[in-house]
Amino acid sequence: MKLNKVHNIDFLNNDLPDKCANLIIADPPYYKTKGDFDFIWKTFEDYLLDVEKWCLECKRLLSDNGTLFWYGGSKNIAYAQIIFDKHFYLLNNLTWNKGSFMGLEESEILRSFAPCTERILMYSNETYNLTQCIFMIRDYIRAEIIKAKGKIVLKQVNEALGTATNGGGVASACLSLDKTEPTMLTKEMYQKLQSWCKPYLTKEYEELRKEYEELRRPFKNKFNLQEVLNFSNEQAKTGAKYDHDTVKPETLTRALILTCSRENDLVIVPFSGSGTECAMSAKEKRNFIGYEITEKHAKMSQERANKILKEPTLF
């Protein structure tokens, strides 16, 4: 699996292993909206058949704690959502507000309101959630207590923690098997359990916390974004530069990548187009693998990313 490469092949013909993608950013053809690639299907039903194929391939590739972004036009995104909702868990139906659109908001020529938005569906794998991360930590602690004490008596655990002396309280919240959402122990409480369970429960709290964080789906909202994403459409400036009809803004793409992935994560780009997603992945120290059926766009995407990859760093 060669990283940081744009393949000039159909995304459906990839040879990637299952669950390899930490983040998928897919900007597919919207169907009869803009660009030659939007008009290759005879009917909308034919287009939706391909959407289903793309969806299933994304499902195969997305890791258990990964995130998928799926772009679409405001008129047709509902049809894609019906398909994706069958296979993923919908986190957000995001609206990308592009701002002023060719001054049409001041004109009545369209006989309707000016189109200034696109949609981005945000999905996770419905089979994996935060609770499962806590279950793994809880099960480790339970196993170590059993090694040390032979069995788990919640009252004794509470006494060791210096909390309630009955069978409920903190011990029940953190360790009981019948809790649908167990609570994470604080560092102070965990260290008390370590002293009580010597020579077992040897993992340090910071090690457990790091494991917990790495198991969670990445989401750090450093840009304070909400469901409406206000990013100007840079296409007027970048479209001609990259010779593509649907160039996505670098600012928006960077925000999605930084919010929903970690450094060295793998970003899969099923439709690399002008190369924005690949280039911004490289810029933010993520690995990427892109796919593009048009040769000139595949070459352009690779060159755009390579320019960033070859930039000297301070360290």
Question: Which residues does each PLM region occupy?
Answer:
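Core catalytic lobe of class I
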Residues: 1-291, 296-298
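Conserved SAM-binding loop
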Residues: 301-302
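Positively charged, low-complexity nucleic-acid-binding target-recognition regions
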Residues: 307-315
